[in-house]
Amino acid sequence: MDKLRIMTNNVWSCGSNKPWWIERGLDCSSQARAPKFAPLYKETMPDLIGWQEGDKHFRTLVLPEMKNLGMNYDMIEGGDTSILYNKDSLELLESYFEEYPETIPEYEGKFNNNNTKSFCIGVFKTKESGKLLAFASTHLWWMSGNPIHSHYQPNSNEAREYQINMLLDKLEKIREKYNCPAIAVGDFNAEYDSLAVKATFDRGYRHAHDIAVEYADERDGYHFCFPDGYKPYKNPKPFVEGIDHIVIKGEPDGFVRRFERYTPDYYMPLSDHFPAWIDVEI
């Protein structure tokens, strides 16, 4: 029985320091923040990490720091949605990367800002027992589909639904090819009761939170951390308002043991999204 920890982590793409931070002697630039993710990963030791907003500069800063800490990890280069994996526990068999199109058929508007919305897939074999696993990291369109929201753009909900189905089309082919469980993680920019999440359910996927055997975190895992400042994570919203998701298909019984959001104080100025992970047995 292999035990794996699988994480999704939006690391916040913010390349330069901003006035609010400078005035307080702080630094929110990627140059300052990126190295601080390596100790986080050393502390938690995920076997797989699906990134969002991990741009090229950020990627070049984190992996060397992880190696300095004695961590034997490698990366599937997948744009802002790259995948990191533990080479001590996993062997990479196949990978795939695709950017979502800027436009969506039948819907007016553009739905990919600076080519940051994409998905990356890796197929892995566990080194302990040779079990197979397909893993995908994605970041869906960010603007709101709610007309009263300050960042409203018409058809945004439908765009996210279209994008997640693009990912699942590819992931399903890979899952069937290898006859293995498939896990999709990422920043959906959509809550539990959304078209995007429901689209995964309609295709036979289940949310890790809903099938966790031992523990399921009931917090949303999102807080205020932006160019104009950051705040402590107080009075978290409920799970159903979270936008970072982990969905699974083809898993054996009891596969997901725990679903957790990791919210240490030192992480508050690193990103608006707290890491979420699952502990699985395969």
Q: Where is each model-derived feature located?
A:
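N-terminal, active-site-proximal structural segment of metallo-dependent hydrolase catalytic domains
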Residues: 1-65, 165, 282
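Short, Asp-centered acidic motifs that coordinate Mg2+ and/or phosphate
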Residues: 4, 47-48, 133, 181-183, ...
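Active-site environment of divalent metal-dependent phosphoester hydrolases
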Residues: 13-16, 56-60, 142-146, 189-197, ...
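Structured beta-strand-rich core segments of catalytic domains in phosphoester-bond hydrolases
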Residues: 48-142, 260
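His/acidic metal-ligating clusters that form di-metal
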Residues: 118-138, 149-190, 197
